[in-house]
């Protein structure tokens, strides 16, 4: 399931997956096909990288919510293009 999240000051839409059994302070979740969103649209995140899975610490995520239908559609469009 995709989520809208605020990660280190960036608004992202991504599939979020928990990594079980991690130590405190270690990266404990995976963001898949993350894209940064704003009023102009969406771009792959992080910029300048072709990585589609980012291992991050959940403590760097300050907000988690359901994305709007518009940003969900943008996310799936970008994901489809990156999978090609």
Name each region found by the language model.
Residues 1-84:
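Conserved RNA-binding domains used in RNP assembly and mRNA/RNA metabolism
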């Amino acid at each position: 399931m995709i989520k809208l999240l605020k990660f280190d000051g960036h608004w992202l839409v991504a599939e979020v997956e928990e990594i079980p059994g991690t130590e405190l302070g270690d990266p404990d979740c995976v963001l898949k096909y993350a894209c940064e969103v704003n009023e102009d649209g969406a771009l792959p995140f992080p910029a300048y990288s072709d990585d589609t899975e980012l291992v991050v610490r959940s403590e760097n995520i300050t907000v988690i919510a359901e994305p709007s239908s518009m940003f969900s559609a943008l996310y799936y469009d970008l994901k489809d293009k990156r999978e090609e």
